[in-house]
Amino acid sequence: MDKNHTTFENLALLEENLSPSSFSLMLYENAFSKIKLIQEIVKKQTLPVLFVDLDFLFSGYVKSQMLAIPNLSLFNTVESTITGILPKVLTKISTEPHLIIFDSINGLYNTLSNNADSGRVVNSILMLLGQNSKFSNSILVTFALAGKKDNNWVLPNGRQILENENMKKFFISDRSKITIEK
């Protein structure tokens, strides 16, 4: 991972907004820049990290020991189901604040692809995590591979991304520039 010398323009902007009880959505174009950004976020945090990895890229880096992160609890759907992961995450944040990284909304849709109401379930899960992280003074960061269509952020499967007044949206360009979305 050290061979990727990605530096992020405006990283301080992101760091200023990752505060207790915050809910941030990171929209990205490049999965490897996303992993490097996660590494930057995590190394500056003092909170224990709960990482829900639904696209398995981060898990691969951790399992191969290319990334070593202290205080990391890693969850993925290879080892459990989303319905098994959520109670564990909620229990952990009920006892102490954590940095919760939920990667990614795309992976959650894929996990729930057989559910006719997957859109509602995805939104409900995100709202549940958002509210519980707020009550526990945790920091919730979710990721989504997305692009703009008609001034709205949409996932590659065409679904529009949840809008929430409590959520801060950031865009990580392919050139690793971080901008805040209004």
PLM features: residue spans?
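Pre-Walker A adenine-sensing motif
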Residues: 1-19
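Conserved P-loop
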Residues: 19-88
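Short, well-ordered alpha-helix to beta-strand connector turns
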Residues: 20-23, 45-46, 69-72, 96-97, ...
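Structural motif
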Residues: 25, 99-103, 141
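Conserved nucleotide-binding/hydrolysis micro-motifs of P-loop NTPases
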Residues: 56-58, 79-80, 106-108, 146-149
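Short, well-ordered secondary-structure micro-motifs
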Residues: 61-63, 111-113, 151-154
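Phosphate-binding/switch loop-helix module in NTP-utilizing enzymes
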Residues: 77-136
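Phosphate-binding/switch region of NTP-binding enzymes
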Residues: 132-182
